[in-house]
């Protein structure tokens, strides 16, 4: 997970009960952000929906922005965890294809909504821009080993370039509409990503 960038984060949970409350807040915030977008997101309404006082939410996240940053950080950490988990999925080729497939599936759902939201916010808010960049930096770093595994003759600069090309393909594919049979589409995305990494 990227390092916390926001000094307004409250004292995060130090007890099992505190951890549970913090997790409930983050899960509910994620759901509301996916359903209503950032304009419809408020700490007060979130607290009410959880049957908590606003001050209870603010104990963990002093501001709306602090909570949003945490939701985005956690979502990005889950993407990196997918890469790490899938690296043991058979051969280097099978693992790489599994990573690409799983990321495209995730990004066609709620995860894609959240990361698109972060991308939009980052255009206008410096703190979110910093988080957006650090998320992609961590993502690129996690993807380097699977790309290198596809062609171990590549130098570091070429690996970094191919990581970005694979990311561009995987990042953009969930935004496409009318893709026809989803399984065929996913297979083709995997084929193209493999070609980028291997050739």
Residue ranges of predicted features:
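Helix-turn-helix
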Residues: 21-24, 28-66, 70
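Hydrophobic/aromatic-rich alpha-helical bundle segments in the mid-to-C-terminal region
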Residues: 129-133, 150-199
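Solvent-exposed, amphipathic alpha-helical segments
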Residues: 24, 28-36, 82, 114, ...
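Hydrophobic alpha-helical connector segments
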Residues: 70, 81-112, 162-166
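N-terminal intrinsically disordered/low-complexity leader segments
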Residues: 1-20
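Short, basic, alpha-helical segments at the C-terminal edge of helix-turn-helix-like DNA-binding modules
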Residues: 73-79
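Amphipathic alpha-helical segments used for helix-helix packing
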Residues: 108-130
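Short, solvent-exposed amphipathic helices
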Residues: 131-142
